Every structure is written in C-alpha cells, then in structure tokens.
Curated annotation (Swiss-Prot):
This is Glutamate-1-semialdehyde 2,1-aminomutase. Signal peptide: none annotated. It comes from Paraburkholderia phytofirmans (strain DSM 17436 / LMG 22146 / PsJN). Belongs to the class-III pyridoxal-phosphate-dependent aminotransferase family. HemL subfamily. It is an enzyme of class 5 (isomerase). Its main location: cytoplasm. The gene is hemL. SUPFAM superfamilies: PLP-dependent transferases. One of its GO terms (biological process) is protoporphyrinogen IX biosynthetic process. Its EC number is 5.4.3.8. Homodimer. It is found in: Cytoplasm. GO terms for molecular function: glutamate-1-semialdehyde 2,1-aminomutase activity; pyridoxal phosphate binding; transaminase activity.
C-alpha cells in the first residue's frame, strides 16, 4: 500500500469518511485522496513524495502561491505576541480599513472565521433589518452549510423549498426559495408573487461550486433593480470570487453595488478568516449597536489577520490582476486547443484567477447546463492529469484557481500533460 492509502485507511477509523470536508475524499472521481505534507509556490507534495502543480490553491485562498515569503514573515512577526486574545486589536482595524478601501460598497465590515459564518450572519442581519423571513437563492450557488442555504427548489417556482441535506428541518427550508441562475423572467415572476416578503436575495455573481458559471450582466442588473424596488437586501457572496476575479471583486467587474458582501478565502491568506460588510445603516443593526446578534471567539484572530492583511497589500501591486488573468486565460485556451486537436467535446472559461473546465460542447450558464457535463470523461481526465503531476479539482462541479506564481512555463507544462490526457480520452 502507498502511504496515501495507509493514511486514508487510518483516517477513516476516526474521521467520518476520512476527511474534514467531503470533496477531499475523491468520492466524485474515485481513487485514493492525496494527503498533502507540504507546499511551496505553485506546487504541493503528497505523503508519497509526489509533486503536483496545484490548481485548487486551498479552494481559492492561495492567490500568491503557497508560503509566500512576505506573508510568512508577517505571520512569524506576530506569533510571539500571542495566538488569540478575545479582545480588540489594532490589526483588526487595519484589515477592516483595507477591505473598506478596496470594496467601495462596504462601509463597515465584521470579521468572522469562515465563509459559512459570513453568509449565515449576513442573512440573519438582512432578516433583522427588514423584519422579513423569506430568502431567495439560486440553484447551483453554494453559500456554506447553514441550514437555510442547504435547500433546493421544489417542482415549481412558487413551491416551498425542500432541504437537500438530512438534518435540515422543513420548517427552516420553507423560508428559502430557490430560482434558476441567470433566469431573469423567473426572478421577476418571484418578486411579483411575493416580493414584499423577501428579506434578502443572496447570489454568487461568479459561481464556483457548480464549476465556474458567470452571472449575466442583465441578471445582476435585474436583481439590483428588484431588490431596490421591494426593499430587499441584495447580498453578493464573494467568498470565492472576491479579490479573485478583480481587486474589487465581481462587483467591480459588473459595476453592480450590493447592499451586503460576504468575503473569505483570499482575505485570510490561507488562514481561517472571512468577513461580511456593506451599508452602514444595515450594519448598524448588528450587536452591540443593534438587536441582531453575531459573535465569535476567534473572529479577527491576530495571526489570521496578519496573513490576510499582508495578502491584501501584495495583491495591489501594479499589473497583478492583468498578469493573473492573462496566465489563467493562457491555461484555459491551451486546454481547449489540445482538446480540439483530440476531438474531445470540451469547453473552458476563466475570469481573473478562476477557471472552469467543462466536458460539454459549450460554456454553461446555469446549473441545468452544468449537469450535462460528461462526468465519467472528466473523471478519467482528472486521473490522467493527477498521474502526470497536475492536481485539478477532484469534481466536475468545482472551479479551479491559478496563483500569481503559476508562470508561463508551469502553464505550458500543464497543457503538454493535457495533450496526452485528451489523446487517451479520444482513443
């Protein structure tokens, strides 16, 4: 047995499924998950010493690559001061100021420790602000594992939601309405039917958990207009795409201003940190100012804040996002070209440092289109690339990520490996 296999067998005795987050178990693609021992730059190494070009980047945070020397120095500098205080720090103020500067829609911000906490808290705040209960989300958009958000639509637009996870009470699910992503007509119908009941609409402006799917400008414009007309709070979940697709996030790309924004991943620099923020009049309803309670023992943890603040400073370097976008586009265009050479149905898309690979004839715009992907062929491709030392997301329904240290040589090596993988799929 390989060391990865031994560790996986051992892990399953004490950890449900052997992992602490389901996608890591390789259930979607089959085989043994890789247990990572260390990482550096664009690479990581597994328990058997195999090196991989890393295209998940800890599912988004590692925009600078692993163990960036300046981030490492920032963390080491504060370690000797204490790990956690449970009291305010100057660094919390500094990162809040930086976030508000970079994302103009955020007038005030509250730090938390995970994306799930950010979305859960933002929804509670929206409900407290509006005194309404109903929330609207979109099929295929993942907003963390809070009960209200683990809901899928029923058979018709106006039916109550049904939970898609065991353990979610129907009484909670019924307050969530799920609509089709990018469907403006369905959105308008929903607001016409019960717009004055909607506390909030939460959306990923660039979805990453049904692979990469972009919102259309018309869809986001309709969301902004309808939320304004009906007094509903528009929440952009930019936990994944915030600081990934542009310095100001997807809201900068689209020119749409949400009421609240959820952030995570990049703002922790690889440490557990997330945030939610937005309009001052809405944020004023949070305790201790208002009646909406939210708290966290490790919120604003000084070590996580040090890593996050240094990361936010470094990504402001001139040309950073142009370089990141160019390299990501080089990757997806190269993959599409070699797939075409092999006559394998395949499409790819990218925005900033995010990308999507689809074993379909065209780039999808909704969850229904994503599900048409040739999953067995993706799984075969994944393992061919893994054997060649390239680690893509172990699921046909996850976006990938490029860091600033994925240079042209690394991208070209990936494309060369893919040429052989696609050729074998065509055989």
């Amino acid at each position: 047995m390989s060391r990865n296999e031994t560790l996986f067998e051992r892990a399953q005795r004490t950890i449900p499924g052997g992992v602490n987050s389901p996608v890591r178990a390789f259930r979607s693609v089959g085989g043994t998950p890789r247990f990572i021992e260390r990482a550096q730059g664009p690479y990581f190494w597994d328990a058997d010493g195999q090196r991989y070009i890393d295209y998940i980047g800890s599912w988004g945070p590692m925009i600078l690559g692993h163990v960036h020397p300046e981030v490492l120095e920032a963390v080491q500098r504060v370690l000797g001061n204490g790990f956690s205080f449970g009291a305010p720090t100057e660094s919390e103020v500094e990162i809040a100021e930086e976030i508000c500067k970079l994302v103009p829609s955020i007038e005030q911000v509250r730090m938390v420790s995970s994306g799930t906490e950010a979305t859960m808290s933002a929804l509670r705040l929206a409900r407290g602000f509006t005194n309404r209960s109903r929330i609207v989300k979109f099929e295929g958009c993942y907003h963390g594992h809070a009960d209200s958000l683990l809901v899928k639509a029923g058979s018709g637009l106006l039916t109550f939601g049904n939970p898609t996870s065991a353990g979610v009470p129907a009484d909670i699910a019924k307050h969530t309405t799920v609509l089709e992503y990018n469907n403006v007509a369905e959105l308008e119908e929903a607001f016409k039917a019960f717009g004055n009941e909607i506390a909030s609409v939460i959306v990923e402006p660039v979805a990453g958990n049904m692979n990469l799917v972009r919102a259309t400008p018309e869809f986001l414009q309709a969301l902004r207009r309808l939320c304004t007309e009906h007094g509903s709070v528009l929440i952009f979940d930019e936990v994944m795409c915030g600081f990934r697709v542009a310095l100001g996030g997807a809201q900068e790309v689209y020119g749409i201003t949400p009421d609240l924004t959820c952030l995570g991943k990049v703002i922790g620099g690889g440490m557990p940190a997330a945030a939610f923020g937005g309009r001052r009049d809405i944020m004023a309803h949070l305790a201790p100012l208002g009646g909406v309670y939210q708290a966290g023992t490790l919120s604003g943890n000084p070590i996580a804040v040090a890593a996050g603040l240094k990361t936010l400073q470094l990504i402001q370097a001139p040309g950073f996002y142009d370089t990141l976008a160019t390299r990501t586009a080089r990757l997806v265009q190269g993959l599409a070209n070699v797939a075409r050479e092999a006559k394998v149905p395949f499409a790819a898309d990218s925005l900033g440092g995010m990308f999507g690979l689809y074993f379909t004839d065209s780039i999808p715009t909704s969850f229904a289109e994503v599900t048409k992907s040739d999953v067995p062929r993706f799984n075969a491709f994944f393992h061919k690339m893994l054997d060649a030392g390239v680690y893509f997301a172990p699921s046909a329904y996850e976006a990938g990520f490029v860091s600033i240290v994925h240079d042209d040589a690394i991208v070209d090596a990936t494309i060369d490996a893919a040429r052989g993988a696609f050729a074998s799929l065509a055989a």
